[in-house]
Amino acid sequence: MPEHPDASSLFEQCLVLNREAFAAGYYSTAYHALAAALHLAHARQDTEGLSEVERMASEQLAVIDITAPAYEYSTRSAEASGLPSIFLMLAREAQAILRRLPDEQGSV
């Protein structure tokens, strides 16, 4: 996909929205903003952006697990329903995309 001139700013806007929603306790909204950032980073093959999404998803889940364990997608709540947390799945998705991207050093 060709680079859109505003793709980088869209990525940053998604991260800003994620942080604002997370700070306000709107965890599901924060998740979706972070997922949107993941899709933008993937489209741009932005390894730094993908790594940032992976890190943020993991960090935010850790905070949720401590401060809001009753939230439906905390580790405890998600596992009680037999599923992993959506934040964990987002971190794993970012990791999987990173593994599939071409090596930046030009390896084939």
Regions found by a protein language model. Name each.
Residues 1-20, 27-108:
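C-terminal-biased regions
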